[in-house]
Amino acid sequence: MKALDEPPYLTVGTDVSAKYRGAFCEAKIKTAKRLVKVKVTFRHDSSTVEVQDDHIKGPLKVGAIVEVKNLDGAYQEAVINKLTDASWYTVVFDDGDEKTLRRSSLCLKGERHFAESETLDQLPLTNPEHFGTPVIGKKTNRGRRSNHIPEEESSSSSSDDDEEERKQTDELLGKVVCVDYVSLEKKKAMWFPALVVCPDCSDEIAVKKDNILVRSFKDGKFTSVPRKDVHEITSDTVPKPDAVLKQAFDQALEFHKSRAIPANWKTELKEDSSSSEAEEEEEEEDDEKEKEDNSSEEEEEIEPFPEERENFLQQLYKFMEDRGTPINKRPVLGYRNLNLFKLFRLVHKLGGFDNIESGAVWKQVYQDLGIPVLNSAAGYNVKCAYKKYLYGFEEYCRSANIDFQMALPEKVLNKPCKDCENKEVKVKEESETEIKEVNVEDSKNVMPKEETPAEDESERKENIKPSLGSKKSLLECIPAQSDEEKEAHITKLEENENLEDKDGGRARTEEAFSTEVDGEEEQARSGDETNKEEDEDDEEIEEEEEEDEEEDEDEDDDDNNEEEEFECYPPGMKVQVRYGRGKNQKMYEASIKDSDVEGGEALYLVHYCGWNVRYDEWIKADKIVRPADKNVPKIKHRKKIKNKLDKEKDRDEKYSPKNCKLRRLSKSPFQSNPSPEMVSKLDLADAKNSDTAHIKSIEITSILNGLQASESSAEDSEQEDERCTQDVDNIGKDESKVEHSTHSRNELISKEEQSSPSLLEENKVHTDLVIAKTVSKSPERLRKDMEAISEDTDFEEEDEITKKRKDVKKDTTDKALKPQTKRGKRRYCSADECLQTGSPGKKEDRTKSKEPLCTENSSNSSSDEDEEEKSKAKMTPTKKYNGLEEKRKSLRTTSFYSGFSEVAEKRIKLLNNSDERLQNNRAKDRKDVWSSIQGQWPKKTLKELFSDSDTEAAASPPHPAPDEGAVEESLQTVAEEESCSPIMELEKPLPASVDNKPIEEKPLEVSDRKTEFPSSGSNSVLNTPPTTPESPSSVTITEASQQQSSVTVSVPLPPNQEEVRSIKSETDSTIEVDSVVGELQDLQSEGNSSPAGFDASVSSSSSNQPEPDNPEKACTGQKRVKDTQGVGSSSKKQKRSHKATVVNNKKKGKGTNSSDSEELSAGESVTKTQTIKSVPTGMKTHNSKSPARVQSPGKGGRNGDKDPDLKEPSNRLPKVYKWSFQTSDLENMTSAERISILQEKLQEIRKHYLSLKSEVASIDRRRKRLKKKERESAATSSSSSSPSSSSITAAVMLTLAEPSMSSASQNGMSVECR
């Protein structure tokens, strides 16, 4: 750097400090190539010229007067304005290195390289962190300039000229001018019309001193032309245009008159073109609408002048293109597409770019754009974006007097999403209501179509398709609809049901199909997470899950609609998010990009402010601490979850009515058109697509549990075996088997109908009662069931299974959460349905086992009477049918929870809540109900019922032996319980006579059960053929009497098994029962031959969740039923139930609603599998002997609350169990005491269960390995898993499960808990 006194150039040998690798080092100039440039001003004309020093005479010093050699060789006086040393110096450093440098890299040796005040002592080091930033201002004379003073003087003197030029330019701004220029090609003067614009329009084009910037009308290009070549065009001075310029000239005149923009100054905004950002921005704004929920971006509704936006963007993009800075990419700001027109208007409203000086104003502009403020640079970023894209255009428009409609969007920019969502929800609700009404009408129309089987098939298909199409919308609407709307729809459904009853069972069947389809979708939704969790425990479940996921995709819309109902943070909102774990946990500011609801939990896709988008992730709502803006209230997402749970509960309720409806359909068809209608219905279902037929038949049969249970045991076992293979390999096999079973069932049904029309009539009566109850209780459920049925037709068996599981889970959740009144309703429905379906099943059993029809008729009539009594009880305000049933519900729920030890605590909480609710209702209704029950039933029976710990006593009649007397007592007890709770009825009738006991005993039991359990009891008795060859006939009787005892386990279970049953915890028994029921359901669904048995077991295992449990059980159950065909079936079921329990526990942790239902379904399915595997040997033999009997175990499981227990031990005697207690004692207690006692018992059961669980886990692993091998073999050969391996596993399971079986005998309790 040169000081003022430095020489103009340096000479050789001068000691200098030379810059070497960034530092100044001592050196000496070795050679110099001198070149000094001198800028001088001649005195005579004040002109300035730059010459070399060899043309100058005089001292080379700034301000000196010298003589300068002119171009012509003459010398003239001039003053040196500036000296520039451009010499090249070669220097030698101390170490001998040489380097050639410019003067700027040299300074005289000894020169201080810092200012006087720049010592560290004097530096004001106010900010040590910024030590590198210079505190002292930079030197003014940087570079090679020796002095700036003369230059400043000259520039200041010339500022006047600049002002004059600016004035002239300002006068021309916006004027239409003609520009003269010389064409080099044609070598003649040319001109073109142009518009004078502000030089600030273009940064790319340098506008010189005497030039102005114009935009040509000819090609739209911007050019800088000399001021002297521009002439304004006026009406007087109009040059004659060439032919080439005619159009441009016309456009110029048009612009001069009306400011009409020429076409070539606009660009067509095409999607493909690089400058087609207008439409793209519109799309971006649409995206912004969706993302931000801010309707301010909706151009169609909000933009006051939508055409103006297009006009603006067309001109803007063309302008940017013509000036050489095309917009090739969408403008983005804050990870959002930038609405340039809106930004332009916002800045215009504030007076233009130059008038905005405060960064706070720019930040406000940023917020007004609707973009979430990510960081403190928001204002700067929007300012830069404006300068880049719009500043030049703003100057251009100002100078050219081009105006736009600058009205801003009419609505508030940051509109709360809730309003929008509410509007959308309202609209959706309205549309949904209309859709539901349409569907109801469709179902009505379907009834007349059912007159002929062929027409039924074709029309059904047509009806099912539209119902499927509107399924999603219906499901979406259901949650959104208010209770009043739901009630209205329920009444409509009831009316439809009545019409269907009149017309025949066909219409009901169709409704059931559609209901099942809807139910399945609902199940798929609630069960998505459940299925995922079940992956870990069961490969079979994994296959089902895959199909569920496919269904889930269809259900995404439904979920989205549900989300709208939930209170969610709107996209774009900034929130504080917890990130990391433990000590590393930090709080980050994030903006919400999207939200979703999964499994009752709100999920958010968040973008961490200031972080790359690759860190965007989905987080749970609990990770959000609070909104970044403290003024925004924090949303309680628990409310959302509750809402979702409620919705799921509603769906579950709907689903259980669906089951009732389906069962009713089957019964009513039998009643009105006994054999022909049922056959036609089944045939129609079979005639439908193979998948549809299988699925529908399976679900219908599972719903009609009795029907499926009545199928031949041989068919069921075969179908189960096939199912195992199919689950492993393909669902298609299951479908074919299901069709086969459906046909066989149809035949059986027709036979039964012919043999016992009176039974059908009784069943019809029961069905009507149950249906009426169900309809009144849960019309929505019926609706969903109908829709689910139609869906089932489309979905494969696995879908059905997963859906069933979902239903089970939903029911479980509903049970826990919903008042017991709802549970009671469900139980009635399920019980009635079981009874209804059970009667057909019984008919089949009769025909197969040649049992006397009179016994069935008597049992059906008795069951009908019981159902009537139950319906009366239901009609009473004490929906809880009895304190007993309510208690049972609570007990079932608790036992169920304890069954899944891991989830036990959560479930206990749920149970406690539900128990409290139920108990509140019970306290009111118990007296009336109890008095009515006492009047209806003998004291002896009541004692038995309640001594079993409510349901336990009923569930396990006298344990001692399957004596007929004991069976009858148990049946009576069950009947009493059933009168209290239709679910109990269902469960009890199912087990009827499982084993090969004398037919006489069976009819007796059946008749007793019929009286006790109207139709379901009789059905189950008739349907239950000897479960396993091992089980003696006496055991069968016992099972029939116990009906709740595990039918799967051969009645002749050894005393050890009985002991095990007694020992087994209620939870385990519930699980086992559930699994048995699931297996039975699976068999039923596969064979579609014994729906009654399955339904009974399902209803008994979980009275509230009969249908959901049945579906899941049907899935795993089918596979397991194949295995279960031996005595080992119960043991295998136990194994599976334990597995399921583990899985279910995990699931429980994830979601309360889904977890409960999942646990039930999983546990049940596991138990079923275990039982099935142990049973296979016996079952197979029985199948050959009496196929109906195989299904009877399922029925047994169904038969009553005891079903779970009965299912596994197949013959649980009415033993007093370790965890049993008197119902009367419970009634005397307060709700709190009752809960505490139940909790204590559950804890005991849980401890016992945990001891069994570890043993079962190892067996399960072994079973899984065996199953994999079996699947591999099954893939090649359609044969099911080898009976030997299944039987072995079953034997091991039985050994382990003995205690669990004993607990299962406590089914009454477990049923109540459920």
UniProtKB/Swiss-Prot annotation:
GO-annotated cellular components: cytosol; mitochondrion; nucleus; Sin3-type complex
Modified-residue entries (Phosphoserine), positions: 276, 295-296, 482, 666, 668, 675, 717, 778, 790, 1016, 1031, 1154-1155, 1157, 1161
Keywords: Chromatin regulator, Coiled coil, DNA-binding, Isopeptide bond, Nucleus, Phosphoprotein, Transcription, Transcription regulation, Ubl conjugation
Compositional bias per record (Basic residues), positions renumbered to this chain: 1132-1150
Coiled-coil region: 1227-1272
Changes seen on gene knockout: Embryonic lethal. Lethality occurs between embryonic day E3.5 and E7.5. Heterozygous males are fully fertile. Double knockouts of ARID4B heterozygotes with ARID4A homozygotes show various hematological abnormalities, which are more severe than the ARID4A phenotype alone. Hematopoietic stem cell (HSC) and common myeloid progenitor (CMP) counts in bone marrow and spleen are increased. Lymphocyte numbers in spleen are significantly reduced. In peripheral blood, red blood cell counts and lymphocyte counts are reduced.
Subcellular location as annotated: Nucleus
Segments forming domain ARID: 306-398
Record-listed cross-link Glycyl lysine isopeptide (Lys-Gly) (interchain with G-Cter in SUMO2), residues: K428, K461, K751
UniProt keyword Protein transport present: no
Protein name: AT-rich interactive domain-containing protein 4B
Organism, as annotated: Mus musculus (Mouse)
